[in-house]
Amino acid sequence: MNPPAWKYRGIVFARAAALLVALPVVAFAASPSDAPTVTFRKIFKSSYPEFVEIKVTQRGTGTYDIRQLDDEASPAPFVIGAPLTQRIFELTTKLRNFQGLDLDVHRRIANLGEKTFRYEKAGETHEVKFNYTLDDSATQLLNIFEGLTRQESDLSNLERAMRYDRLGVNDAVRQVEADYNQKLLPEPERLLSPLDRVGADTTFVDIARQRARALATRIRAAH
């Protein structure tokens, strides 16, 4: 069951406030339009989520908005590491900043959701839309953004369970563990803070605490 909208907005606001405090002042020293930005958008009606939009600047700052189409837009700030940021822009360069690009296979296949890549810099804008592509660079870029979608969803679900559904924390940690095992999370170290809090909090069930500690240990050992 999806959480009440006010609870989800509370989680997003809390994460946004904490992130704004933590971000270096230099990140806001220049106008956002000064930094090249890559945007990924996916619209897939009757799925969950139906709408995803992730924006990443060349500084590694950005926003994510993951929701159903009927929900109010609620983009929240987030950051990614320098290596992942560099990889996103390397792939974008290989794809000519999406200028004059045709990625779709143009075959009769199932609707997998409309995806959009967009590049913006100082008034320059290029974008490409597709349902399915065989282009290797585009597939790699898509996998990164799909992974970020999964990662931010896992993080929000875990933090929501910690606040409002303590008995559901074990299920949330187990989902993070499953996604980590399948190598779906581009930066699993971003989940260490909530995992550590679960592991140290005696108000959560023992199995959740044990699982969180074990997963955090694995992530630290690998990253």
Q: What does each model-found stretch correspond to?
A:
Residues 28-44, 101-223:
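Short, well-ordered, aromatic-rich surface patches in folded extracellular/luminal domains
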Residues 53-57, 75-80, 123-134:
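Short amphipathic beta-strand/extended segments with alternating polar/hydrophobic composition
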Residues 84-106:
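Charged, amphipathic alpha-helical segments
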